[in-house]
């Protein structure tokens, strides 16, 4: 149980693939123009991570170390192709919106990194949990960045949610800011870099406050000197 909690804590916050390791920045910055796109790519990446880690862990005893990387890439490519076809079949609007960034999951350093660093050395269950935690950590970062850019750029949230969840999801669209003209900087690549910088700064501030709180609550027990110990006796 402690190992599972540690994996969740590492993937979601302490070793977040997007905000700590800074992996997968290309899709993180390019696709996060809306919350829907960010959530769609994040969930697709999470599914790929879980399936890839499970397959690599299950086959780890039979994969020669000399050719493990090409085999891992083949496994990742097969899983990504399957996910791409599923999105094409059941969420075609999202498939068109994400475009080339779905097949580019194959080259995402998060996927191959977790396969090599964790799944190849650990049991199937923990490897699947590691993939889920890392994927959800990246998804949360993508979603927050996408929501921030969409709100500042268009004044809306969950615009186009029907592309991901179906026609019923049109009711999820929320008009937060009533803008006469869109704030283009938030929607362009410079806005993505600025938003990512704000997220990194926010995480740093939260981490520092958590460290300070732990330091303040830590109880220090003073050590008795030899003379004090004799008097006590």
UniProtKB/Swiss-Prot annotation:
Its main location: membrane. The keyword NADP does not apply. InterPro entries: NqrDE/RnfAE, RnfE. The chain crosses the membrane at residues 18-38, 39-59, 69-89, 92-112, 128-148, 182-202. One of its GO terms (biological process) is electron transport chain. GO terms for cellular component: plasma membrane. Its EC number is 7.-.-.-. HAMAP family: RsxE_RnfE. Belongs to the NqrDE/RnfAE family. The complex is composed of six subunits: RnfA, RnfB, RnfC, RnfD, RnfE and RnfG. Part of a membrane-bound complex that couples electron transfer with translocation of ions across the membrane. NCBIfam families: PRK12405.1, rnfE. This is Ion-translocating oxidoreductase complex subunit E. It comes from Yersinia pestis. The lineage of its organism: Bacteria, Pseudomonadati, Pseudomonadota, Gammaproteobacteria, Enterobacterales. The gene is rnfE.
């Amino acid at each position: 149980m402690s190992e599972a909690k540690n994996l969740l804590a590492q993937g979601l916050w302490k070793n977040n693939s997007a905000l700590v390791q800074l992996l997968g920045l290309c899709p993180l910055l390019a696709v996060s123009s809306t919350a829907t796109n960010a959530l769609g790519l994040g969930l697709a990446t999470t599914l790929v991570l879980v399936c890839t880690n499970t397959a690599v862990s299950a086959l780890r005893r039979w994969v020669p170390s000399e050719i493990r990387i090409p085999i891992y890439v083949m496994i990742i490519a097969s899983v990504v192709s399957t996910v791409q076809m599923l999105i094409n079949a059941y969420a075609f609007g999202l498939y068109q919106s994400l475009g080339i960034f779905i097949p580019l999951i194959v080259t995402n350093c998060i996927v191959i990194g977790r396969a090599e660093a964790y799944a190849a050395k650990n049991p199937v269950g923990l490897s699947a949990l590691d993939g889920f935690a890392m994927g959800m950590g990246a998804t949360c970062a993508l979603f927050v960045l996408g929501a921030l850019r969409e709100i500042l750029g268009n004044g809306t949230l969950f615009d186009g949610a029907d592309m991901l969840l179906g026609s019923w999801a049109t009711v999820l669209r929320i008009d937060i800011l009533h803008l006469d003209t869109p704030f283009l900087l938030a929607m362009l690549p410079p806005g993505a870099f600025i938003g990512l910088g704000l997220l990194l700064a926010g995480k740093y501030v939260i981490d520092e406050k958590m460290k300070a709180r732990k330091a303040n609550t830590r109880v220090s027990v003073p050590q008795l000197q030899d003379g004090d110990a004799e008097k006590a006796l």
